[in-house]
Swiss-Prot record:
GO cellular component: cell envelope Sec protein transport complex; cytosol; plasma membrane
Top-level taxonomy: Bacteria, Pseudomonadati, Pseudomonadota, Alphaproteobacteria, Rickettsiales
Example GO molecular function: metal ion binding
Keyword check for S-adenosyl-L-methionine: no
Organism: Orientia tsutsugamushi (strain Boryong)
Name recorded for this polypeptide: Protein translocase subunit SecA
Length: 880
């Protein structure tokens, strides 16, 4: 009571912002009064009028309220829905680049039509981002009706959209798309060889639905495009078999940090088993001998697969493949694989086909991707718990928008039991009570395993129900849409159909099958169904509305709030209650020993529940600790990714410059001049005496780079390094001029551009591989009293400089050996690029033989003499 009294006196920042905006809403109503008289064509023509005003440099905010009024009127005429005042407030806040928190059922999808229309008038594109293909398609079809009526083009991109259709969709005024498709299209675009092959047109304005899920839950996992490497996978099943023979004394597991390590007993046992099957190196009996170090990687990953990763919790097996389950949404992530051999270890554990390990070709986090947008905003039902992170990472303010009708949902206190068995018995009893009076129930679980366990108990009681988890995700929308019908019992994992409202009495549109009906028959049947649903809705309301049951607390308070928010939409009644046990993961791993000891001391009897403020406070504290821990992980990931992001910007900028350039001679000449200066200074140090010059070394090096034998006399006749540089530069440029004469300037330019882009991609890919390895072991620097992040920054920068040097060296070396056989192939760009590729492949052999000829006998672990900074075996010695 005291808290409510204080809140009534001291308004929150959100309250003050909303109060200021309420006066602005009147401007929308004023503008709308004249619009109602317009014909459809006249209303549509307002779009071209707005565009003309913006083209004359009128500020977009000047037309905001009139544009909102146009959208409101168009929505009324097309889909029969009019924006509430609260939705207009939400639209204003989204246009301002804020995150709005709106309760379930308050019409966030409709709100997005306001700022998306307004900003689409600028002609730079608006992306409305959703969490899955179904919602992207649904919103595009439904809300797109409003936009198309107003002569605004609308596109939709899902995982099944082809390249041509993607380009058309991105060029639309408004594009509905998932976050994954956006990120992967960005990475793919930066692997294309021409601007025409790219599909995106830049990052202007994005409205992110379920923004907390995308920018927070998924921020820990970077988007990666990878390619297979020819690593040996034969060891995974062998090591897997040995790991199954270990027991709990052979390893120590920390569930809180999700880490597992072998004990001395486990190491000894493994060494014995490895020796018996002749896996250890000859004359070696220790796993940690240098010759056996590679085995540790396989052992660690297999141990993790068996102890930390559970089937139907962290992953599922479908059609002979291990598929990751998103821990936050409960959905499958079909296109993703665990890195560093973990996925292969899981495949060995589940005895399915083991695929090769992958190497990163391109990578970006959602954090860095969405920060590229000129303007960003978002919507969700639960954002206030993450307001600090959204502000610190993305500079986004969160504002809570009031509900249109007062919330009538009742949230009961948690019930805590000593065992899972007692907890499930209480849940089943409550479900039976609700079922007997016709009250619909939604049961939220944290994993597939738990949802199927509960389903078996309901089957044993002969209670009909639906199960919604990653195994049945294809029926997600239809199951959730009907979860508000009389006697409907629905068990769902975290996914819980976010984005699909649970309507009391059911959803008429989804109940009527239109496939075999004429439009007239469909409308008639829909009318009858809606009347039946209205009657059913009254019965459900009288029974108490939808009852949401939580079977355990999640690690994040936000996900608990999302589950509660499934009921009580638009002022409907609803009830929620969480059932917990001391055996739940959250209680077992994170709750304090003090709480557990108190409960053990109390000595709960079988089937007896406890309600205690200390328990609720302890749970809230445990959740806050986990949220803080996950926030630190995300912040840390961003700090490391920022290092790569700066480098990524340089590479992508250089790549795009080359692709867009009609003439790459400037790039070629600049890099040639830089390389020649560096090479000359290596053999003729600045301000050195002539007798200290290493002319023989310089001649060999120049021949290795440009495939040209210099006359010693020409260099010996000069008296300064500057003149040597001029002579060598002229010689190199003469090579390029000769190529233009031999093949034509256009053909040579196309081939050189192709060589530059391919060489850039190759060196960048190798650099990412090196950074991956650097990142894996960098945390160990802390033991040497060094900051791992600073060490990573320093070494990553050094590696980047070495990569740029290697790029320069390899590119010029390849151009100098360019040969296009015009006699045997037509003079077209496509065939020219193909010929250029073939020449590059054949040239590699030449490079390698030259490397051994001029470098002599070199250890494979020595640094390559070409100054790339790489080991010889990874550079010129890699092609042996």
């Amino acid at each position: 009571m005291m808290l409510k009294f204080i809140k009534s006196i001291f308004k929150t920042p959100s309250d003050r912002i909303i109060a200021n905006l309420k006066s602005k809403i009147q401007q929308v109503h004023s503008a709308e009064s004249s619009l109602a008289k317009l014909s459809n064509i006249e209303l549509r023509n307002k779009t071209s009028e707005f565009k003309a005003r913006l083209a004359n440099n009128e500020p977009i905010d000047n037309i905001q309220y009139e544009a909102f009024a146009v959208v409101r009127e168009a929505a009324k005429r097309t889909i029969g829905i009019q924006h509430y005042d609260e939705q207009l407030i939400g639209g204003i806040l989204l246009h301002q680049g804020k995150v709005i928190e709106m309760s379930t059922g308050e019409g966030k999808t409709l709100v997005a039509t306001l700022p998306s229309y307004l900003n689409a008038l600028m002609g730079k594109g608006v992306h409305v981002v959703t969490v899955n293909d179904y919602l992207a398609q649904r919103d595009s079809d439904w809300m797109g009706t409003i936009h198309r009526f107003l002569d605004i083009t609308v596109g939709c991109i899902t995982s099944n959209t082809n390249e041509h259709a993607r380009k058309i969709a991105y060029n639309s005024d408004i594009t509905y798309i998932t976050n994954n498709e956006l990120g992967f299209d960005f990475l793919r675009d930066n692997m294309q060889f021409t601007n025409q092959s790219k599909v995106q047109r830049g990052c202007n304005y994005a409205i992110i639905d379920e923004i907390d899920s995308i920018l927070i839950d998924e921020a820990r996992t970077p988007l990666i495009i990878s390619g297979p490497v020819s690593d040996n996978t034969s060891l995974y099943p062998i090591i897997n078999k040995l790991i199954t023979k270990l027991n709990k004394d052979d390893y120590e597991m920390d569930e809180k940090l999700r880490n597992v390590t072998l004990t001395d007993l486990g190491i000894n046992k493994l060494e014995t088993m490895l020796a018996e099957i002749n896996i250890l190196a000859p004359n070696s009996n220790s796993l940690y001998d240098f010759e056996n170090m590679h085995l540790i990687h396989y052992i660690n990953q297999s141990l993790k697969a068996h102890t930390l990763f559970r089937r139907n919790v962290d992953y599922l097996v479908k059609n002979g493949k291990v598929i990751i389950i998103d821990e936050f949404t409960g959905r499958t992530m079909d296109s993703r694989r665990y890195s560093e051999g973990l996925h292969q270890a899981l495949e060995a554990k589940e005895k399915v086909e083991i695929q090769n390990e992958n190497q990163t070709l391109a990578s970006i986090t959602f954090q860095n991707y969405f920060r590229m947008y000129t303007k960003l905003s978002g919507m969700t039902g639960t954002a206030m718990t993450e307001a600090t992170e959204l502000k610190e990472i993305y500079d986004l303010d969160v504002v809570t928008v009031p509900t249109h009708n007062p919330v009538q949902r009742i949230d009961y206190d948690d019930e805590i039991y000593s065992t899972k068995k007692d907890k499930y018995s209480a849940i089943i009893q409550l479900i039976q009570e609700c079922y007997s009076k016709g009250q619909p129930v939604l049961v939220g679980t944290v994993s597939i395993e738990k949802s199927e366990e509960l389903s078996k108990l309901l089957h044993s009681k002969k209670i009909p129900h639906n199960v919604l988890n990653a195994k049945h995700h294809d029926k997600e929308a239809s199951i959730i849409a009907q979860a508000g019908r009389i006697k409907a019992i629905t068990i769902a994992t975290n996914m819980a159909g976010r984005g699909t409202d649970i309507m009391l009495g059911g959803n008429a549109e989804m109940l009527v099958d239109q496939s075999n009906l004429t439009e007239e028959e469909y409308q008639e049947k829909l009318k009858i169904t809606k009347m039946q649903i209205e009657q059913e809705k009254e019965q459900v309301i009288n029974a108490g509305g939808l009852f949401v049951i939580g079977t355990e607390r999640h690690e994040s308070r936000r996900i608990d709030n999302q589950l509660r928010g499934r009921c009580g939409r638009q002022g409907d009644p609803g009830q929620t209650k969480f059932f917990l046990s001391l055996e739940d993961d959250l209680m077992r791993i994170f709750a304090s020993d003090r709480v557990t000891n108190i409960l053990r001391t109390i000595g709960l009897k079988d089937g007896e529940a406890i309600h205690h403020p200390l328990i609720n406070r302890s749970l809230a504290t445990a959740q806050q600790k986990i949220e803080a821990q996950n926030y630190e992980i995300r912040k840390n990931l961003l700090k490391y990714d920022n290092v790569m992001n700066d480098q990524r910007k340089v590479i992508y900028e250089q790549r795009n410059e080359a692709i867009s350039s009609d003439n790459v001679n400037e790039i070629l000449h600049n890099l040639t001049e830089e390389l020649i200066v560096e090479t000359v200074h290596k053999f003729i140090p600045p301000k050195s005496y002539k007798e200290d010059w290493n002319i023989h070394g310089l001649v060999k090096e120049y021949h290795h780079i440009f495939n040209v034998k210099l006359q010693l006399d020409s260099i010996e006749a000069t008296d300064s390094s500057l003149k040597v540089i001029e002579y060598l530069t002229k010689t190199a440029f003469d090579i390029y001029k000769q190529q233009e004469q031999d093949y034509s300037a256009k053909s040579a330019n196309e081939a050189i551009k192709h060589i530059f882009i391919k060489t850039l991609d190759q060196t960048w890919k190798e650099h990412l591989y090196t950074l991956d390895h650097l990142k894996q072991g960098i945390s160990l620097r802390a033991y040497g009293q060094k900051d791992p992040l600073n060490e990573y920054k320093r070494e990553a920068f050094d590696l980047f400089k070495q990569m740029l040097l290697h790029l320069k060296y390899l590119f010029i070396q390849r151009v100098a050996r360019l040969h296009i056989d015009l006699a045997s192939s037509p003079k077209s760009t496509s065939s020219l690029l193909e010929t250029s590729d073939n020449n590059l492949k054949s040239k590699i052999i030449t490079e390698n033989s030259m490397a051994h000829k001029y470098f002599g006998k070199i250890s494979r672990n020595q640094l390559c003499p070409c100054n790339s900074g790489k080991k010889f075996k990874h550079c010129h010695g890699a092609l042996k």
